[in-house]
Amino acid sequence: MNILITSQKAEIAGSTYSVVYLAKGLAHRGHNVWVATPTDTLLWRLLSDSPVQLVEVSFAFKFHLPSVQKVKKLVQLHQINIVNAQSSKDRYSTILARWWYKLPIKLIHTRRQLVKSLGLFGQSTFYEQGTDAIVAVSKGVKQSAKNIGISEEHIKVIYNGTPAEKYQHIDPNKVNLLRQRYQIKDNDIVIGCVARHKEQIQLLRALTEIQHPVHVLFVGIEERPKFRAVQNRWPAPHRVHFAGSVDNREVLHHYPLFTMNVLPSTIEGLSQALLEAMALGVPVIATEIGGNSELIQDGVNGLLFQNGDANTLASHIQRLIDDEDLRENFSRTGKKTALEDFSIDKMLDHYEAFFTELLETKQHH
């Protein structure tokens, strides 16, 4: 297959890494893969040393004519037969390119986050009429797309995957340096939270009910003034560390420090951070929202709580502090979930089968 993947929004986020795994994986399986994205993006940097062919397209705004024309040229020059758009502005450009130039392609949009709003008037109709299918990375994302008017039969669920090989390069020396930086002792309880724009304050509120002193390690954000007011109410001398924004290789070296990983998110599609924690054997607690409840079976390979319910979050944290056997059980079952049930190979198998099916239906017309 000749496949063009487009993405205008490619900053430090799990979704960017998911696009990288898809593009590289399809290229390694022998498909010709082009990725159209702005040059100053993380996506460009991550793919620059790979068999994927990169093309600079700005997708500066939704009706950006030069981007529409570039998509047309790419399709015609390379005889592209599958176009897979990943973010909002390139979704518009790809639909317009196909309509205006009557391009003989199959066009698929991928949704990686819960769809929160209808957007522009008629946008859901525009997306459905303009594409052959929409891929949702979880059933939760599919439901949110249905809620804004996309018909069920137009949406295909293909879960994100995580590549086992990325966990084989964790350097124990780097982990020890981080342990020293944060002054973590061997028996300390460390609650990790790897996320950018989530409801991290829920975790801080939950700690007002935890008497046992813990470390909290936020990876992905800086300290914020609103956090300080909550910390002042803590009954125990919990220690909070903010690692700020770090690249994925460095993020991975933080997980071995964690006793547990908490993800207090509100719009999760299918979290790479949860997959990473589970793959590395870290017990997980997450909001029962989006794809979180498809990754985590409550009480089997992790724990779930309702968004905003700091009391239940606190009791889950206390339970994992107290019960080492449960932690070991979640570690084992979580690892199996991430590396077997949500493997990269499974994800790529599903994309290949779906793209092939779409191309075959095209040939029947």
For every predicted segment, state its role:
Residues 75, 245-246, 253-258:
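Short alpha-helical donor nucleotide-sugar binding micro-motif in glycosyltransferases
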Residues 228-246:
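Nucleotide-activated donor-binding/catalytic signature segment of Leloir-type glycosyltransferases, i.e.
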Residues 266:
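Aromatic "clamp/platform" in nucleotide-sugar-dependent glycosyltransferases that forms part
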Residues 13-21, 189, 193-209, 303, ...:
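A conserved mid-protein helix/loop that constitutes part of the nucleotide-sugar donor-binding site
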Residues 36-42, 162, 194-197, 215-228, ...:
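Glycosyltransferase donor-sugar binding loop
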Residues 36-37, 283-286, 296:
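Short hydrophobic beta-strand element within catalytic cores of glycosyltransferases
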Residues 297-299, 303-310, 319-325:
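Conserved acidic donor-binding segment of nucleotide-sugar-dependent glycosyltransferases
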Residues 105-135:
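A conserved, positively charged/aromatic
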